[in-house]
Amino acid sequence: MTTHQTDHDGASSEGTVTVTEAGSGTYTQQINAGHHRIVADEPRPIGDDAGPTPYDLLLAALGACTSMTVRMYADRKGWPLRRVRVTLRHSRIHARDCADCETSVGFVDQIDRDIELTGDLDDTQRERLLYMADRCPVHQTLTSEVHITTSLR
């Protein structure tokens, strides 16, 4: 069993995220990622709305990774990309309403991602950046087989 250490001030080691009940509010969580601290919560009336929900954080991970990947590619190519904005929405839809889904019964999670590119880009550059958006590591993780192991201490 692998254990991950936190340093004396509660910060997680590189590549490890630690989530702990904050002690304030019913569902409020303190998230430590390296030396960064984030609060997560559920919206009212379930929680105290002290921070983004877990699904908000999932969308934020995909949006940030998408924007960073597009930016890195455009910079490497020397393309005139001034700004990237990614807007994401999560919903659960009936599987029968999803033409591209393998699942045919029950519900599936759907993420709608809208990418706005600002800059003097031609159509070929825009299409290539759209292609690269799907190559961001978080997108690759979410669309591939994921194996999660859980241990209890």
Annotate each PLM feature.
Residues M1-A60, R71-R153:
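Extended beta-strand/beta-hairpin segments
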